[in-house]
């Protein structure tokens, strides 16, 4: 087995995961190994990325558990590092959580509503859109359930993941469309409340048009 191959990484991960994953050293080794695998194999390979995300999600759950039971900041830091890695690679739930990492917990939008969104399959459906398992996702819920704000958050992530692609959003009134535009801009432009630029450090705002409610990321132009 060649060192640095996918099979080699799988073997090393298995060895770590078969040990005590409640130990900080093993969790940190897992994180560092994921970073190395990303650099050596790249996550453009779907099999590699799917495997890495599976490992990362298990590790971040263990880090969250240990942070809650021990109160140790080291576990909490690792938890967020795993989420950042996942959020940078098209994971909706992780990206939504990480966007509000720096917000006061009582002021967060997503985390307090997360279990309800999960229970009704909303986040999984958004993930299925990202994974190309769904072409259309239709959601009908009563007013005040947070669907418009969730759309703001989701679209800000989609814009970061695909900055040179066209993403169209509209509503039944110009007021709601403008609200969506303002919401996405706030998430992108407010580094105190949101961590959008930590997730997408290489994506820059190139221009906005308030009249047409358009946002250009990465590069301008009609033909991106």
Residue ranges and their predicted role:
Residues 2-224:
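Phosphate/NTP-binding elements of NTP-utilizing enzymes
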